């Protein structure tokens, strides 16, 4: 397996080669490092990774030595001869979004304010991946404090789309998506509050999973909107996402919002060996298509065509597909931005230049000191959202805005939950268009916010959703659709996506 083949391979392909002894973890890490270094020297770099960890090769050597030691001691022949018990991800690298803590590494959230901050511990999801043998490869670019839909609001500069470097890779986890799509990492962690995993996945032609709220621990993630935030995954195949979920999901004592799925949900645990739905199982499935999203203004004809192609495929599998109405979805984007900005204003109050953030002029009065630190440290989009959030929470307007938005959010969650009692899935496009040109929306906040039209309701309703690449536009830009399930039904979502992935035309 040569270096180019390594950087095009999925986790599962690399895992098979490692267990067969055909390649080493050190070869894998070096192959990705070479792609990263070559890209940084190019005239138009992707800007996907902001740091390639210097100790990644050392961890790779340790993984190779452990595998060799176990193989020698067990003398096991056959398929499991190169596997190591309890470490299904041994020697496999992954990239980490810059707002997820990796012990001893910078965690800047793409902000000048945290330029010198190093994480004192691993995020729980990172720790669980490490415990399974995986190797953190580097930090990925992001919109500052995860506030954006294009990865242009970053102190490191924009991230470009590997399919067309004049266009966005999406946001706020655009660096993670570009790293995987651009051959700089085989797998990446992102976070999403209103679509920041699924949108970049759609724009870059990847699978992107946003799990049920609470399935993955948020411990070690720098908070944006605490009732919305969730770690998600970027991968080139369904099996990689299933493999990651199998080792990272579950209750964490460090995060009170994390939980194990209630037994009454009948949720099947996601395992590495995930089978697609059979033909018989497909015949009893029902999928709902919300008219409010399909008929939304601004949907590009290429997106509509690829979505209809996916619906045609569903019907060919004997899945019952029906159009439905979800009236509350029309309020999803404004409700999301009211809730998210209010929570952001509260969460970001800690970055005052005293305990967190860069210190300013210590001779200034406290109020002036805070103002100076935040004005110089926060970018314009973060400042805008903090101002909106404080306005929403102010004594005179909290009843008009925040409390009303919370009530409407409950209505959205209720409508989605009731619908999913009658249907197994909701399906819709991930975005109204393919990746848009860099600079097109950065000076038009409302246009940027409307990028989240198809994604925010999922976060408000705390549902699992997967962006699935289904084709390309007439100009070759990737197009994605979403498969959305009931809470805790990640396994069902992934199984339907895997049947699509394994279909002859894919």
From Swiss-Prot:
Signal peptide: none annotated. PROSITE patterns: AMIDASES. It holds the Pfam family Amidase. Coiled coil: none annotated. Its EC number is 6.3.5.7. GO terms for cellular component: glutamyl-tRNA(Gln) amidotransferase complex. The keyword Nucleotide-binding applies. Keywords: ATP-binding, Ligase, Nucleotide-binding, Protein biosynthesis. It is an enzyme of class 6 (ligase). GO terms for molecular function: ATP binding; glutaminyl-tRNA synthase (glutamine-hydrolyzing) activity. Heterotrimer of A, B and C subunits. Allows the formation of correctly charged Gln-tRNA(Gln) through the transamidation of misacylated Glu-tRNA(Gln) in organisms which lack glutaminyl-tRNA synthetase. The reaction takes place in the presence of glutamine and ATP through an activated gamma-phospho-Glu-tRNA(Gln). This is Glutamyl-tRNA(Gln) amidotransferase subunit A. The lineage of its organism: Bacteria, Pseudomonadati, Spirochaetota, Spirochaetia, Spirochaetales.
């Amino acid at each position: 397996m040569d270096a180019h083949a390594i950087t095009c391979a999925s986790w599962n392909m690399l895992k098979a080669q490692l267990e067969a002894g055909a390649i080493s973890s050190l070869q894998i890490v070096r192959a990705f490092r070479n792609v990263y270094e070559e890209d940084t020297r190019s005239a138009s770099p992707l800007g996907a990774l902001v740091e390639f960890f210097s100790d990644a090769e050392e961890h790779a050597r340790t993984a190779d030595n452990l595998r060799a030691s176990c193989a020698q001691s067990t003398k096991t022949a056959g398929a499991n001869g190169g596997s190591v018990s309890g470490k299904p991800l041994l020697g496999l690298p992954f990239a980490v979004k810059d707002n997820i803590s990796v012990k001893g590494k910078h965690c800047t959230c793409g902000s000048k304010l945290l330029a010198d901050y190093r994480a004192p511990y691993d995020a729980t999801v990172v720790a669980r991946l490490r415990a399974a043998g995986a190797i953190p490869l580097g930090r990925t670019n992001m919109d500052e404090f995860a506030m954006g839909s294009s990865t242009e609001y970053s102190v490191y500069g924009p991230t470009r789309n590997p399919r067309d470097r004049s266009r966005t890779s999406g946001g706020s986890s655009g660096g993670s998506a570009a790293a995987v799509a651009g051959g700089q990492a085989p797998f990446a962690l992102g976070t999403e509050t209103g679509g920041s995993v699924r949108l970049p996945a759609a724009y870059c032609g990847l699978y992107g999973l946003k799990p049920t709220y609470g399935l993955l621990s948020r411990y070690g993630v720098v908070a944006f909107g605490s009732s919305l935030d969730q770690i998600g995954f970027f991968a080139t195949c369904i099996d990689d996402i299933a493999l990651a979920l199998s080792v990272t999901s579950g209750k964490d004592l460090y995060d009170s919002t994390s939980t194990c799925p209630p037994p009454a949900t009948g949720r099947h645990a996601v395992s590495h060996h995930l089978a697609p739905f059979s033909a018989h199982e497909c015949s009893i499935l029902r999928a709902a298509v919300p008219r409010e999203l399909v008929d939304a203004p601004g949907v590009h004809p290429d997106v509509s065509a690829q979505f209809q192609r996916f619906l045609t495929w569903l019907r060919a599998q004997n899945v019952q597909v029906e159009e439905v109405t979800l009236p509350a979805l029309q309020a999803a984007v404004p409700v999301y931005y009211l809730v998210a900005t209010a929570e952001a204003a509260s969460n970001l109050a800690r970055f005052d230049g005293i305990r967190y953030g860069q210190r300013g002029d210590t001779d200034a009065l406290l109020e002036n000191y805070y103002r100076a630190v935040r004005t110089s440290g926060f970018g314009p989009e973060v400042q805008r959202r903090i101002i909106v959030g404080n306005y929403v929470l102010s004594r005179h307007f909290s009843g008009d805005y925040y409390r009303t938005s919370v009530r409407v959010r409950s209505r959205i969650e209720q409508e989605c939950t009731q619908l999913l009692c009658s249907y197994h899935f909701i399906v819709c496009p991930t975005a109204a268009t393919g990746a848009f040109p860099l600079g097109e929306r950065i000076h038009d906040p409302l246009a940027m916010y409307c990028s989240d039209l198809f994604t925010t309701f999922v976060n408000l309703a705390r549902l699992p959703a997967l962006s699935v690449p289904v084709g390309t536009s007439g100009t070759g830009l990737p197009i994605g659709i979403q498969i959305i399930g009931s809470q805790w039904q990640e396994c069902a979502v992934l199984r339907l996506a895997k049947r699509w992935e394994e279909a002859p035309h894919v």
